C-alpha cells in the first residue's frame, strides 16, 4: 500500500490515472487500525487494477477537509483524479469496501 502525505496526494491521487482507493485514518482511530490489515489484503487481491493508498489525516487535516472527509474511517475511491464513491464510519466494513471496488471496476 502506498503511504500518502499532503505533498504526494495531489500527484498520486488527483493527477493519477485509473482507480485509486484512499484509506483515510488517524493515529487515534481504533476502528481504522482494526480495518487496516484487511484493506492491505484487499490491495493484494486487486493489485494491477486498483492502487491502494493510505493517508494519515493527523498531519493533513486541511487536505482531509478539502476532500470532505468528515469522519473516520473513510475509504474513498477515485477514478482519474475524481472521487467516484466512498464508504465511511459504520459502513466502512471490508465487505462494503470490496463491493464498492467491484461495482466500479466491473463497469
UniProtKB/Swiss-Prot annotation:
GO molecular function, one term: protein-disulfide reductase activity
Keyword Disulfide bond attached: yes
Pfam families linked to this entry: Thioredoxin
Keyword NADP set for record: no
One GO cellular component term: cytoplasm
Keyword set, alphabetical order: Disulfide bond, Electron transport, Redox-active center, Transport
InterPro entries with a match to the protein in the record: Thioredoxin-like_sf, Thioredoxin_CS, Thioredoxin_domain
Disulfide bond sites: 29-32
Location of the Thioredoxin domain: 2-106
SUPFAM superfamilies, alphabetized: Thioredoxin-like
NCBIfam families in the record: ThioredTrxAClost
Family per record: Belongs to the thioredoxin family.
Record function comment: Participates in various redox reactions through the reversible oxidation of its active center dithiol to a disulfide and catalyzes dithiol-disulfide exchange reactions.
Protein name as it appears in the record: Thioredoxin
Source species of the chain: Peptoclostridium litorale (Clostridium litorale)
Amino acid at each position: 500500500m502506498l503511504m500518502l502525505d499532503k505533498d504526494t496526494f495531489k500527484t498520486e491521487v488527483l493527477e493519477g490515472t485509473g482507480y485509486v482507493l484512499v484509506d483515510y485514518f488517524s493515529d487515534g482511530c481504533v476502528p481504522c487500525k482494526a480495518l487496516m490489515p484487511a484493506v492491505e489484503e484487499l490491495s493484494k487481491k486487486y493489485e494491477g487494477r486498483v492502487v491502494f493508498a493510505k493517508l494519515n489525516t493527523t498531519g493533513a487535516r486541511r487536505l482531509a477537509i478539502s476532500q470532505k472527509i468528515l469522519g473516520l474511517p473513510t475509504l474513498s475511491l477515485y477514478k482519474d483524479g475524481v472521487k467516484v464513491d466512498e464508504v465511511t464510519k459504520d459502513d466502512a466494513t471490508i465487505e462494503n469496501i470490496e463491493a464498492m471496488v467491484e461495482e466500479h471496476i466491473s463497469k
